Amino acid sequence: MSIRRVMHVDLDAFFVSVEQAVRPELKDKPVIVGGKPERRGVVAAASYEARKFGIHSGMPLITAKNLCPQAIFIEGNHQLYREYSEKFMLILSDFSPFLEPMGLDEAYLEVTGFESLHGSIAEMASKIRRRITAEMGINASIGIANSKVAAKIATERAKPNGQCEVPAGEEASFLAPLDIAVMPGIGKKTEQHLKSLGIDTLGKLAALPASFLKSRLGAYAPYLSNAAMGIDNRPVEMPSEAKSISRETTFETDTRNQTFLEAKLSYLSEKITATLRKRGKQARVVQIKIRFADFTTLTRQKHLGQPASGNREIFQTALSLMNGILDSDRQTVRLLGVGISDFCGPEKQLEIDPAKARLEKLDASLDKIRQKYGFSSVQTGRTYRLKDMF
């Protein structure tokens, strides 16, 4: 039986890193996202250059200005951050189908047994980090351990732009010397209370009798006691079912290359139909979204004659919608997205088209391989044109 391996991936200084990716002149400078310091606001994110001055998230902007007068203050662009977050999750889903997003900039991956695909889990983490840097222009840190809590703490030890793996069986010794403040779930008040009792490290917390800890912290005590030793059996939980499924990607360079756009559309269509089939559903509506170089965004949708869940039906419908938009506007394309909605259960068919049956069997085979080994473990002919992204 494989030893459990959980990966926690966190984008370094996410908001600021995105701003620096799209505005290279901000690189290596103290940058603060949150707005102008004259306002009554707080720091949403600070670059590592700004953090050297003691600036951190949640700090009043005016305080940050006093600490670092030369800092560059910017409003932030949450639509842009969401686009980057979607690209981030898309990359992660290529490595494992067991993905639990935690906000825009971090996620857990269940990677138990994936060594055979990548040589080692550490090499898998390196591949993920390289792809994020290459495709998004920002850095990520990764922690690997036998549980979610240990993996998250390992990520903090890896920052910035690094990775840290806790060997199986060494979780308790890894955590023991660390300050209790690093433990997720220990807030300022709990930290102060524990330290007033002389409990300042996770090792000391783990050594406390369960009865004593419960008398001080109540029902939360058993979790903290176990977590301090790296014991955390919580599963990686995928998001609950939504009423629509969509994928979109923002290109590094605006393009009108038809072959490239079709390949990207095919890739996105395969992603959403795989999710649809995993839910045992079919879709009645297909939608396409295109954003041009001037940020004009157009959407089109079509109601299908028959509900569908196959790659081919969804892609061909999306392709027709995409070409309709492109024929009406000659600008280069910045963003491409495809979505499906109005779900229903699979309908019983009195007559089965042999060709359609073969395609359904092919889709099922692809799904089975990808669910076990990750989405990028097998590629179709059209998406193979995008092999550089894998």
Swiss-Prot record:
GO terms for molecular function: damaged DNA binding; DNA-directed DNA polymerase activity; magnesium ion binding. GO terms for cellular component: cytosol. Its main location: cytoplasm. The record marks 15 as: Substrate discrimination. Binds 2 magnesium ions per subunit. CDD domains: PolY_Pol_IV_kappa. Residues 6-187 form the UmuC domain. It is found in: Cytoplasm. Its EC number is 2.7.7.7. The keyword ATP-binding does not apply. It holds the Pfam family IMS_HHH. Keywords: Cytoplasm, DNA damage, DNA repair, DNA replication, DNA-binding, DNA-directed DNA polymerase, Magnesium, Metal-binding, Mutator protein, Nucleotidyltransferase, Transferase. The active site is at 106. Mg(2+) binds at residues 10, 105. Its cofactor is Mg(2+). One of its GO terms (biological process) is error-prone translesion synthesis. SUPFAM superfamilies: DNA/RNA polymerases (SSF56672), Lesion bypass DNA polymerase (Y-family), little finger domain (SSF100879). It catalyses: DNA(n) + a 2'-deoxyribonucleoside 5'-triphosphate = DNA(n+1) + diphosphate. Poorly processive, error-prone DNA polymerase involved in untargeted mutagenesis. Copies undamaged DNA at stalled replication forks, which arise in vivo from mismatched or misaligned primer ends. These misaligned primers can be extended by PolIV. Exhibits no 3'-5' exonuclease (proofreading) activity. May be involved in translesional synthesis, in conjunction with the beta clamp from PolIII. Monomer. Belongs to the DNA polymerase type-Y family. This is DNA polymerase IV. It comes from Dehalococcoides mccartyi (strain CBDB1).
